[in-house]
Amino acid sequence: SSRFMKTMTEGPNPAPLFPKLTPRDVHKMAVGQVGYTGWCDEDGKMLDDGTVSRLGENLFRLTSAEPSLRWLSMNAVGMDVTITEVTEQVAALSLQGPKSRTVLNRVCAKSLDKLKYFRVMPNTLAGKPVTISRTGYTGDLGYEIWIDVADALHVWDALMAAGNDYGIVPCGILAMDMARVEAGLFMIDVDYTAANHAWIEGQKSTPLEMGLDWAVQLDKPGYFVGRRALEREKSEGSAWKLMGFEVDWESMERLFAASGLPPQIPGMAVRGSLPLLLGGNQVGYASTSTWSPVLKKYIALVHLQRPYYEPGTQLQMEITVEHKRLHANGKVVKLPFYEPEWKKK
């Protein structure tokens, strides 16, 4: 099943709710379209992020990491909408990878060949009614299958059987961690702290700081929560930015060789703060770092203060060698680190 919360909103006119809550222009979304978005408090600080799917003219589904029922209900006062928490009723299975479409076409009544990136369609999978969205958390070609909880195991078994010829394997969040970092995708509670959970202002982030400029549509009409703060940040520039960081491999080799060791690479992504320095002064930190099996590089999602977030900036990242804290050279890069050509085809 999925680790995220799911909420349905419907009614004679539920469309105004999401344009009020999110910086995305949800009014423009067609039926069958999915939009990724963050949402903010009044100060433009992120509370959560997820997707809005327009399943019908007046039917929307929101996914989020945190329970959102109360937040939606508070903002829907006076609107003619019904908001329902469906996390326990709807299961979501994520099928990701270059062969995901081929596998789905084996077990679905309707072909997935025409389903575009970030679109959603009703289908039948192994005899069970499902909704399939071309979305995911890996940065690869992939789909998420939305099903009644009672049918989830049947659908899982059908997918495992259909994918057997292609070496399909179950995958947990720690494996997905490596893929999501390669794809430049951040995670709540790891790469940013929800504004309503932060102890101090410095722990909060804005969608512009998190690189979601493309999802903050300030040209859309009307008010949305956090709009004024985000307009101010857009004109003044962001104090911090989420960027990529590539560690120089030879620099790491030298640091480990000084202790008579080959470079020690963690077998999974490291969720933890690692300082980034310039000339001995800390200018930011890594929030998730990992060895990239695809790129054969040690990479990290990093938060950097202005002006150090410009691509190409040479910095040092803290690494530990034999219980000693040392600093490996590296450079700031744009995200994503990797995007396969077939992802959006």
Question: What are these model-predicted stretches?
Answer:
Residues 1-40, 45, 174:
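Acidic, proline/glycine-enriched N-terminal capping motif
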